[in-house]
Amino acid sequence: MTASVDLSSYRDQHFKGSRSEQERSLRDSTTLYVGNLSFYTTEEQIHELFSRCGDVRIIVMGLDKYKKTPCGFCFVEYYTRAEAEAAMRFVNGTRLDDRLIRVDWDAGFIEGRQYGRGKTGGQVRDEYRTDYDAGRGGYGKLLSQKIAPNTDNR
C-alpha cells in the first residue's frame, strides 16, 4: 500500500470485536468515513465528488441523533477496494463546500452509526468547540447553550 491508503491510527472505540478483527476489517473494507463536512453539504454533492473515483454503492449521511439533521460526516461505500483506495488517494484533503474534508477507512457501516455520538446529538468534536464555524452550526453546542439568552423571563 502507498502512504495515502494506509490505515490511520484512529480506531472506532465502539467496534464490536477484537483489535485484530478490526484491523482485518479495515484492510479489506470498501467503506470510507468522510469527516469535516459542512452541515449544509448534500448527499448529491458527495456523490458527485466520490463517483469520480468509482461506482458508489451507497452514501449514508451522518445525522444529529435528536434532530435528524446532517452533522458533518458520512460514510461512502464502493463496490471494490480499488475504487475506495482511489478515493483515499484523490479525495482526502480536497475542498467540498469550502472545507478541507478528511477521508479515512471505516470497518463497514452498521445501522445506528449514522448518528452523532455527542451528548447533544451531534459529533463530539462539535460539542466543545470555542471557535465560530458557520459551516458546522456556529459555536460549539455546549458553549452555545451557555451563552444563549434566557428567553423564559418575559
Swiss-Prot record:
Main location: nucleus
Residues bound to mRNA: Y10, Y33, R102, V103, D104, W105, D106, R113, Q114, Y115, G116, R117, Q123, V124
Spans annotated as Disordered: 1-23
Biased composition (Basic and acidic residues): 9-23
Cited CDD domains: RRM_NCBP2
Gene3D superfamilies named among the record's database cross-references: 3.30.70.330
Coiled coil regions, renumbered to chain: none
Record-level GO BP terms: mRNA cis splicing, via spliceosome; negative regulation of viral genome replication; primary miRNA processing; regulatory ncRNA-mediated post-transcriptional gene silencing; siRNA processing
GO cellular component, one term: presynaptic cytosol
Residue intervals of the RRM domain: 30-108
GO molecular function: RNA cap binding
Record bears the keyword tRNA-binding: no
Keyword RNA-binding: yes
Keywords: mRNA processing, mRNA splicing, Nucleus, RNA-binding, RNA-mediated gene silencing
Pfam annotation, one family: RRM_1
Annotated localization: Nucleus
Subunit architecture: Component of the nuclear cap-binding complex (CBC), a heterodimer composed of Cbp80 and Cbp20 that interacts with m7GpppG-capped RNA. Interacts with Ars2.
Function summary: Component of the cap-binding complex (CBC), which binds co-transcriptionally to the 5' cap of pre-mRNAs and is involved in various processes such as pre-mRNA splicing and RNA-mediated gene silencing (RNAi). The CBC complex is involved in miRNA-mediated RNA interference via its interaction with Ars2 and is required for primary microRNAs (miRNAs) processing. Also involved in innate immunity via the short interfering RNAs (siRNAs) processing machinery by restricting the viral RNA production.
The family this protein is said to belong to: Belongs to the RRM NCBP2 family.
Entry protein name: Nuclear cap-binding protein subunit 2
